[in-house]
């Protein structure tokens, strides 16, 4: 290795540096809002520099932000929300003192850093609450108790990938661990404690085999012979093959008694006789069961991977997939349950760096220099990757790549003394190691303090997970590898449990934990499919879906939209004009046959345009169209865009120009759809076009006949909300929050959507309710909830008397944070519209990123599986594997297509509407049949699905960041294009100004443009 530092002797090899590491007006008869106090915003915590003496980052290098700490969730039971003191929420109006805010929740920045010693608060009864006793923390909120189990549906048995875990009868002790000098690597920490146990288990540890979390906590099944003890532990560096003496490192380890983990409380909680889950006891058991897998495999999160747990499959561009398993212990109705699932992720192939680069670029680089774009791509892919040198025989020193040189190797020199003498890298390697560098036109890798390593002397170290964004081909390859038939997945899970041999796990034995090797048998019910209403002019006026599916044959959309003027632009070079004309003609005929008032011909002939001229072509053609329509005082209703199959950023550019600049909705079609052009493709396109121009495809028969409990009896608005985060490695991109809400009642089928940008990886939706100071109007209230409530009133003529809020994307550890902040925002938004206006709220979290899978009890029984071998749509489980006391359920609302279906998990965090289990399960399942884009039931409730689509669409509205090292991040509360035009800016944690999203045109805002 060549160094740029002036020095008297060359440190050609050195140890690895080690760091891993506006409201827009009021609806009629809404009262004037009361002035609201201006909320103060608190800045986010300061950024942290990695520990240890690390070199300054090379030019353009990004600083990695520290993740926010998230408080551990504690399970609770229900609090009465108004005058009731029973376990479920009261149906009477909210107490007056709580109308302004049911909870004074902290701002997101305050929630991100919980107090280390929170005050001990008693649960609050809202009936006796005064303004001085408004709940302010998770300790004062109780989630609703389960209101009994559901009874509707056909009963059946299913199997779940949960394995009963016997609760140990042990006296668990918790000890604090301090290791000096402090290191950030869990691997090093574990090595230190492992050596300590090897040396002192029989003596100082009293024969105990402790379980260690790799950080600050150590647990034992019984007390150690001391309350505090100091140890000196020496570790030797790995043998690098040089034959030289291995470096020693000495650590001071202090172990102090901290507390006892109360397993009795856990037992009471599992039996439903204790309200709060003892999180520490659960954490201990989880750590114990992770000890052995952490030593055997590569741990990431709650999963463990190995190249020997299945076939390694190439993913392309230097990546490969490793198989593994997910493991988590959970409290359930059947007791403790170990959830085991198959898993796979991408690893970097252990290739010579020069071969990795050739795969990454899909090009032979052995005889040519790199372009600037290629160099940037390589730099992003290799930064942080660990390599070992190969030019010194058996000596394999390891380094972590920090960057890439701009100059090729042949131009690189470095000072060798303080007199200014310089030497080239090529000369240095020849003289020092007798190694002739062959590829001198390639850049060098930079490691440590900008020392140089030629690519050809480096090989990537095995076992490094790839945490950056995968491209579409890699995602497809990974999905193909992980996609398993339900029967095969069940078989592999059972094999993995037997392979892990928990009965022989020394840590499980030490702590008395016994794991069953049989999947849990669970009672389930198959909910009936709802009857769907279509237009009276069709041959079939309604239909009953079969196995989650139906079609549009002999049916007309219940409310067909109008498209009087439309045009088509073709960006696909291989699609001839005659083909485009034929496709447009057939699509228009299908839209007419489906019930739409659709003009048979476009107002202008289809235009062929270059894919690199999207904005220019669209705006020019729109101008031509308006020259025709303007004198007639008409507007353009629709754009049909034909795109290449691999269209890169073309799709996003088209959507941005249409929705932000021109104010028209669009329907994109890929080349393969145009050439194939069968009735199914055309019918699906017609479904999407209809809702984009304001129509309805279908509604529930029970909705129009007003037979849906707690929905059709009084005006009800259903919300869906989601936050999408940028991909790993995109440290400067904001998170996008989206909220949609039904705009028709009792049909609950049309949804308007709002979006906003907010702080990077911020999960709380910061723009639900906002107030700001206007120079003319004074204090102004706004936010997404308020605007959607006003929009509902304008559309239906009714004020919502009931709110059902489906919230997607929330992990279990964030339940309290999200409920405290977002329910408070809903309350304030309602109060800002009218004094004493507080509709009853039910707040439900929707989860798909879990690892519970349900399998048919008998895979050979054709009456219990669909065509893909999965459980039937409508299968619901609210027993055994669900929460011991709280209101949750698993629902597989869709028919499988490929692989193993993943049921959605619904967890009720707040319920003032007093839903029964049957009422909420039936409502949720039935709504899944109203998704606008297809004639199938979908896997999650449509409002949550629409929120995800809206958030995904909004990412196209942001200006692309093409810099190599952008540092701009978004901050809290940026008004989005759908929620007004406030241009106020706040500050992000790093002090950078927040960049609002561009404003969406009102003509687009009113319809389901995101479908």
UniProtKB/Swiss-Prot annotation:
Coiled coil: none annotated. GO terms for cellular component: cytoplasm; nucleus. Residues 127-140 have a biased composition (Polar residues). SMART domains: DUF1785, PAZ, Piwi. Keywords: RNA-mediated gene silencing. Gene3D superfamilies: 3.40.50.2300, paz domain, Ribonuclease H-like superfamily/Ribonuclease H. GO terms for biological process: regulatory ncRNA-mediated gene silencing. Residues 638-959 form the Piwi domain. GO terms for molecular function: RNA binding; RNA endonuclease activity. Residues 1-11 have a biased composition (Basic residues). It comes from the Eukaryota. Pfam families: ArgoL1, ArgoL2, ArgoMid, ArgoN, PAZ, Piwi. Probably involved in the RNA silencing pathway. May bind to short RNAs such as microRNAs (miRNAs) or short interfering RNAs (siRNAs), and represses the translation of mRNAs which are complementary to them. Belongs to the argonaute family. Ago subfamily. This is Protein argonaute 1C. It comes from Oryza sativa subsp. japonica. The lineage of its organism: Eukaryota, Viridiplantae, Streptophyta, Embryophyta, Tracheophyta. The gene is AGO1C.
